[in-house]
């Protein structure tokens, strides 16, 4: 299911990211901040456990989350820019990495790196990629995570295309998608319109 996190702060920050004159330093900071804000909504489903705590006045019931069961997996390379944002809220989460790029000619996924912590049916897994375009890389990543035993999977992006959302919903209907914006469409090269360009290039200043 798709969840568009519609919040004034996110709209404001995403607009700055879209501007072509926004430099890499500000782009990185905004990506981290928006990821943090989306994470707030994307973690509503995770379980909480009771414990007793003592205030300066009396004992009372409290709650905690076991963030050691949480696994954050960025899709390289642009997904790396989202990791710090989610770790600010979940500092004990494990971090894996999936290296996938989309062949510009065939638009098919090409895998080149895969390293994750041990996954099990109680792992709360968050796959990160700023741009959900064709959905090819996302579907490939989700499929591999499931093959390793992952069941509770959430996909977090900054901007999504209708085509990418439909592709994930068809291939993995059990995966929830959280995004800051559902943009209009893909162009002939598989880029999201209006989008914000190549997130990886803008993040790492490679063009």
From Swiss-Prot:
Catalysed reactions, semicolon-separated: UMP + diphosphate = 5-phospho-alpha-D-ribose 1-diphosphate + uracil
Signal sequence residues: none
Protein's UniProt name: Uracil phosphoribosyltransferase
Statement: the UniProt record of this protein carries the keyword Magnesium: yes
Function per UniProt: Catalyzes the conversion of uracil and 5-phospho-alpha-D-ribose 1-diphosphate (PRPP) to UMP and diphosphate.
Keywords: Allosteric enzyme, Glycosyltransferase, GTP-binding, Magnesium, Nucleotide-binding, Transferase
Top-rank EC class of the record's enzyme: transferase
Cofactors required: Mg(2+)
Record EC number: 2.4.2.9
Gene3D superfamilies: 3.40.50.2020
One GO MF term: uracil phosphoribosyltransferase activity
Annotated residues for binding of 5-phospho-alpha-D-ribose 1-diphosphate: 77, 102, 129-137, 198
